[in-house]
Amino acid sequence: MKVYEGGRSLDGAVVTVDGELLDPRFDIRRFSRMGFEWTYEGDGPRQLALALLADHLGDAQRALALTEDFMRDVVAELDNAWRLTSADVEAALRPLPPSPLPRGEGEH
């Protein structure tokens, strides 16, 4: 089971997965130039939601499709220092609607 942890230091917000820095997944989409944030709704929390979901799901498109709801329901509610397990992430995904295509996908 993976363990995701976030906290703040003099260097800013730091997020790890199993003790290693979490990849922000700018290759999928760049929401924030400033990196990760949490405790509110916005671009930094959106980047964290995408990174957590991409790591957990192993599916970039599904992660992108679920980012907004996961950011609002989970990331915006995290404390300054937090810990989530892969089981916590999975439990948070259960009540979310099935992942639609990201905006702009499938439109012709």
What are these regions (language model features)?
Residues 1-2:
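Long, low-hydrophobicity ectodomains and other hydrophilic envelope-associated domains
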Residues 58-96:
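Short, compact, well-ordered microdomains
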Residues 6-7, 11-69:
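Amphipathic alpha-helical packing elements
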Residues 103-108:
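A cross-taxon signal for low-complexity, glycine/charged-rich
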